[in-house]
């Protein structure tokens, strides 16, 4: 498959209004007070919103669901990454966490922009606590990670983020297995970019995990 690289312009500005939700959720993860969650997603309905695709559109419901769910998936990854600023000990883990934060923020903006351009509901970053998907951490796992420090945090972060990234890759795989999905140009490029970037980061995290001192 030939991939066409899309640019990532100043659509990040579109995302600014929602950015503030992420640090506050990260703080709750540290304190363990993430609140109740309704982990649900139904075919044709995402976050309680019905998905209506116009006749003749170059995308299908699965594309919309993928974008909406991946926004939530990315948002939790950012919560995890920001915990490393205060909890991590390994400079390489901190470097990676910042890379994840800095790359997934604009990717959320790209997904929100895609949804708005197609007149679909674009959730904000707080949406991650409304759903549960492949690889996402539970409330208890986030609470444990938020309480950990130093090498213990690094290990939990790497194990958790490997699981999280693998879940994102599985979501892309499921997208392409859905009839007619993943064919719209921008959605196709974005989904493939997710696989490329997160596969590479999984390799980095596995190496870092192997370098940590034994328990």
Where are these regions (language model features)?
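Bacterial N-terminal signal peptides that target proteins for export
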Residues: 2-13, 22
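Low-complexity intrinsically disordered segments
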Residues: 4, 17, 31-34
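Terminal or extended low-complexity segments
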Residues: 9-15, 96, 114
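C-terminal segment of classical bacterial N-terminal signal peptides
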Residues: 17-28
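All-alpha RGS (Regulator of G-protein Signaling) helical domain and cognate RGS-like helical scaffolds
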Residues: 28-215
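Intrinsically disordered, low-complexity regions enriched in small/polar residues
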Residues: 6, 17, 41-44
